[in-house]
A protein has these predicted regions:
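Conserved active-site tyrosine of GNAT-family acetyltransferases
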Residues: 76, 81, 101
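A short coil/beta-turn micro-motif at the C-terminal edge
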Residues: 20-22, 67, 95
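Residue-level recognition of the GNAT/N-acetyltransferase active site
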Residues: 33, 37, 66-68, 93
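Acetyl-CoA-dependent GNAT
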Residues: 1-39, 46-56, 85, 104-114
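Conserved catalytic-core motifs of GNAT/GCN5-like acyltransferases
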Residues: 62-64, 82-99
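Short glycine/proline-centered loop/turn elements that form peptide/ligand docking sites
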Residues: 46, 68-72, 89-94
Length: 114
C-alpha cells in the first residue's frame, strides 16, 4: 500500500495511506497532528499520494469523510475531490453518515500546478 509520512524535527506529524486496484485508488486515511494543522501538511500529503497513484495508472481516487468534518472536506475539495454519494450510518461513535468523494487524477494535477 502506498503511503507518505510527514516529519518535523524527527517527529512524525502526519501520514497518508492509500490503495490502488487497476485504474482506481482509495485514500484510506490522512491524518495530521493537531499542532501542525493548517500549515500545508495535509495538502502536501494529499498532493503527494495523488501524484504517486497517478504515476501508477490510477485515473480516479475515492475516499470517505465524516459529514461533520468540514475542515477535512474543505481540504479534499482543494485537492480536487467532489461529492459523489453518501453512506448512511457509516461511522460509529458517534453514528454518522460518510460523504463519498471522488477526484479525477488529471483534474488534480491541473489544479495542483496553479
Amino acid at each position: 500500500m502506498p503511503f507518505f509520512v510527514a516529519a518535523a524535527e524527527r517527529e512524525i506529524v502526519g501520514y497518508v495511506i492509500a490503495r490502488a486496484a487497476a485504474d482506481e485508488g482509495e485514500i484510506l486515511n490522512l491524518a495530521v497532528a493537531p499542532q501542525f494543522r493548517r500549515r500545508g501538511v495535509g495538502s502536501g500529503l494529499g498532493r503527494a499520494i495523488l501524484e504517486l497513484l497517478g504515476s501508477r495508472g490510477v485515473t480516479a481516487v475515492y475516499l470517505e469523510v465524516r459529514a461533520s468534518n468540514a475542515v477535512a472536506r474543505a481540504l479534499y475539495e482543494q485537492l480536487g475531490f467532489r461529492e459523489v454519494g453518501r453512506r448512511a450510518n457509516y461511522y460509529r461513535r458517534p453514528v454518522e453518515d460518510a460523504i463519498l468523494l471522488r477526484a479525477a487524477i488529471p483534474a488534480v494535477r491541473a489544479s495542483a500546478k496553479l
